């Protein structure tokens, strides 16, 4: 049966929406290109609130070392403007460009930057797996994720073999930590009261733990991760690094931190890991602190859309899942904890505290 649309105006709205979704990969490609060219940094490092397009074209450089074509640069900047990442103006009949509040999260050498997340998510090794999403939808939870079928090994195994991939992953996690740091420290204030030792399970290069021991110097901090991760980790004051398999052994501490770890696994693996964490903390006053996404299926905000995008990413690339409040309740109860609380913070993840 033919569907009759309400009006020409409504039909154009529907067509525009579909065309934007058809070309959805353009957003990621443009974002990656802008970072590779150094567009945001060029504007910021100029020391001026805005620069002309001519100035920008003389500053930025392509990875191939070839010169920039001003007309093509303008077309790229025009699209970045539609993404609210660049503001286009005019001065003395010449186009000018300036940063927006959003693009300030895409600068290098800043306290808050998501550049490394962009580069990791948009790299060829990640992008090629999206072509197999339909296969991922039909893959049972007990089978390897599509990433492993495409590349022959899972992401962690590849990280152990290829230093550049290992750096890409860990730099992305450090990048996320830089953005969530203020909310994390604020949200953990009461939670860490009375905690003298904390171990970050799967804590990568230790950026999160470094922030915590700096904010709470009374805490003895440690990070446990795979040997190839620990070997590449930089020295951090007040942070001890431990090589090991988090599914086999976790050192004892007053509290355990799991930041963006459980979303990489299905429930069975998560329960096993949470039980290990429960054994590592005191039964009377121990805490297992989880930083992970909490999805609200009834919320249609841009934040929820971002969370759902990450849910499909971990499904397709890692074989894990993002979880709702009910999912977290069931998971924590299955792991034998007596109670838990979910604390929203001003960041993508929430803080979930499980008590033995």
Swiss-Prot record:
UniProt catalytic activity: (S)-scoulerine + S-adenosyl-L-methionine = (S)-tetrahydrocolumbamine + S-adenosyl-L-homocysteine + H(+); 3-O-acetyl-4'-O-demethylpapaveroxine + (S)-S-adenosyl-L-methionine = 3-O-acetylpapaveroxine + S-adenosyl-L-homocysteine + H(+)
Gene Ontology molecular function: (S)-scoulerine 9-O-methyltransferase activity; O-methyltransferase activity; protein dimerization activity
Residues binding substrate: 176, 260-264
Tissue: Highly expressed in capsules. Expressed is stems. Expressed at low levels in roots.
InterPro entries from the UniProt entry: COMT-like, O_MeTrfase_dom, Plant_O-MeTrfase_dimerisation, SAM-dependent_MTases_sf, WH-like_DNA-bd_sf, WH_DNA-bd_sf
PROSITE patterns, per the entry: SAM_OMT_II (PS51683)
SUPFAM superfamilies from the UniProt entry: S-adenosyl-L-methionine-dependent methyltransferases (SSF53335), Winged helix' DNA-binding domain (SSF46785)
Gene Ontology BP terms: alkaloid metabolic process; methylation
The protein's name in its UniProt record: Scoulerine-9-O-methyltransferase 2
Organism: Papaver somniferum
Organism phylogeny: Eukaryota, Viridiplantae, Streptophyta, Embryophyta, Tracheophyta
